[in-house]
Amino acid sequence: MKQFKLLFASLVVLLLTSAIPDKRTTIFVIGDSTAANKDTTNGKKERGWAMMLQRCFDANYIVVDNHAVNGRSSKSFINEGRWDKVLEKIKPGDYVIIQFGHNDEKAQPDRHTDPGTTFDANLEKYISETRQRGGIPVLMNCVVRRNFFVKAPEIADDELLRTSTFKDGVKMIEGDTLIDTNGLYKEAPKHVARKTNCHFIDANKITHDLE
């Protein structure tokens, strides 16, 4: 919980330091399901992190406009026209928080990008076009997946086997060490941020420490 609060605190400090006086500033969020608005009816507990961001700000001065959508990659978000809709709303002094990676890893051609080439190029596009509109881009890498599964030993007790699953035909059991699944997709945003002199928040590390 401490690390999760640090994530929001980092955003608050970063955004408040440059807010324009006497004018409502909008914080746009673009990304995937980890940030997206969720259905909260009937006691559903799942939340995208951007759903909670407005609580950090006085809506009389700063408004969060969350455009993150389940299943989107840096590629499909552009190709579906979602980025154009955000871009036309950006005014000078607004912020755009950019967070992709989980779905860029997927094999489907309408979503897949490669770190170091197409993934980086899409992130740079978001940054460049935000700045052209007078906005301030904030780049984040993807949060970690809750992946604690390791290859099952040949002999395991019944309790461990109750939590077993199969991945690529290999029996896996739940372990106590978080397994990285993001690889270069978590590193690419760091490189792009340095290259473009863009604000960067290491959400992957923050959520890794939280786990």
Spell out what each predicted region is.
Residues 22, 81-211:
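Alpha-helical cap/lid subdomain in secreted, periplasmic
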Residues 53, 73, 81:
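Solvent-exposed, flexible loop/coil residues
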